[in-house]
Amino acid sequence: MEDTTFLEGANLAGITTLMNNLHINEQANLEELEKQVMGKQQNFPTDHFDEELNGLAKSLGINFNDPEFSLDSAHSVISKKPSRGGSDMISRDGLRHDGLRRDSVCTDSICSESVCSGSMRSGSMRHGSIRNGSVRDGSVRSGRTRRGPARSSSSRNDRIHSYSLSTHRKKYAESEASQKTVISKRDRKHHYAESEYSEKSIKPSTKQVDRLINHLRSNGDPNSFYKKEHDYDRKTKLVKLEKINMLLTYLGNEQISTDGIKIPTIDSSMQEIDDAIEMLTLRNVGIRYSSIAEEILIGLARGLEIVFDGTREIPFLNYRPDYTGLHNTFMIKLFKMRYETSQVVGNFVQNMSPLSKICLELGPSLLLYPALIRTKHKASEDLYNLLQKGPEDPFTAYNEIHETLKKNNK
């Protein structure tokens, strides 16, 4: 059997020269400890398996050096001649001695999974496997196997030990490799998570730190840097306060109330100034976006009134719809839904360029302007004709003028 001892301590030669003496006990002799570690021998883990296998064979009364035992190459069966006139029987499934069942040995592929998962199962054998010194399956007869004569005890012993050592060395190496792979994956995942967290936590202050370092390299005075930072913050506040004044002017011209909005000053914090700008912007664009939606939808209603005025027939349907006055209904409905229309238009124009917003603002007016001019001209003509007619009763004239204006406004 091959020698399984090896020296791991040789890899530590000279390690004491790399160690920091400041953190080590002064009374410790590092050179002596290094010699002790390098001279220590370690045994391979499979040697413990060989000891257990030999102890198990001894407890079952099996002797590997006995010439009466043979090893089959296809299915390993260990048999022994009866020592008491046939009362002792060894079968492929187990061993029976003096009418008492003993622990069976998993002999398939020479304990490929060790000895029945590390434990012996008592009572797992069946009676009647051997008759007249022969195995029912024909594995062993009179000390000879089907495949040839019984092998020598030395070759059988070497094969058992070499196979067990190679198998368990391979399994030990695979388990060590898999364990290292799992540990490396877990450490790599933890390292990535930790680096991502540190990057997120440091990122907001990176610019300010870079500016401070550049300033110290150029001037070397940190007080002047903080003074410049204060001046920069003050300038930013002044720009934002000017934007707030512009928004207040726009809202005042449109007669939109600004109650409930706290107007900040130069001494206010940057967060308060940003909050005021956000609320004033919402009030400004909310009214404007709702107006855009109303103009677009009313323009579509005006177009339907012109196309379907009760005189045109829809082809294939023989139907003449009359949408006269539809824009009045739209105006009432849209006035109740100003918030919804502003939200729809706001989501639509959120990523639009300023030029596209201008076109969207002026487009509906181009469609509505001709209809407004035509309505005004018609109302003026009807009123002029009514005044030229000159009814005798002033109440009748007033009612006719009122009906004429009401009709033209539809």
From Swiss-Prot:
<feature type="region of interest" description="Disordered">
    <location>
        <begin position="75"/>
        <end position="96"/>
    </location>
</feature>
<feature type="region of interest" description="Disordered">
    <location>
        <begin position="115"/>
        <end position="203"/>
    </location>
</feature>
<feature type="compositionally biased region" description="Low complexity">
    <location>
        <begin position="115"/>
        <end position="127"/>
    </location>
</feature>
<protein>
    <recommendedName>
        <fullName>Uncharacterized protein B407L</fullName>
    </recommendedName>
</protein>
<comment type="similarity">
    <text>Belongs to the asfivirus B407L family.</text>
</comment>
<feature type="compositionally biased region" description="Basic and acidic residues">
    <location>
        <begin position="192"/>
        <end position="203"/>
    </location>
</feature>
<keyword id="KW-0426">Late protein</keyword>
